[in-house]
Amino acid sequence: MIKQDVQKCVDALQDFVDKEIGESVNLFSCKSRANNELLLNIDEKFQLKDKDELHQLGEQKIENQNKLQEIRNKVEYYEKLLTELEEAQKELEVRYKLVSKSK
């Protein structure tokens, strides 16, 4: 009798485990299909660049950064030049005033 009760418990436990495994497998399958569909949609929307094109874009980026740095250097040079010209203009104004007063 105990053996039968134990067997019933084992059978009930096995049924429960089988049911849970079935539900888990079903849920996993549904999520896998949904993820696969999502990946397909993403793949359609966003085309990946090939290695050559990515390399070319990288080189273009470096070239653009170098050009930008050159422009920044020129701007800095012209700003310094402007400051020097403003100082020279002030000196000339002072000299002009001194010359005008001495006449």
UniProtKB/Swiss-Prot annotation:
Residue stretches in coiled coil: 51-102
UniProt-listed Pfam families: BLI1 (PF17324)
Disulfide bond sites: none
Location of the protein in the cell: Endosome
Keywords from the UniProt entry: Coiled coil, Endosome, Transport
InterPro entries hit by this protein: BLI1
GO cellular component, one term: endosome
Family per record: Belongs to the BLI1 family.
Job of this protein: Component of the biogenesis of lysosome-related organelles complex-1 (BLOC-1) involved in endosomal cargo sorting.
Subunit structure: Component of the biogenesis of lysosome-related organelles complex-1 (BLOC-1).
Protein known as: Biogenesis of lysosome-related organelles complex 1 subunit BLI1
UniProt source species: Candida glabrata (strain ATCC 2001 / BCRC 20586 / JCM 3761 / NBRC 0622 / NRRL Y-65 / CBS 138) (Yeast)
Gene name of this polypeptide: BLI1
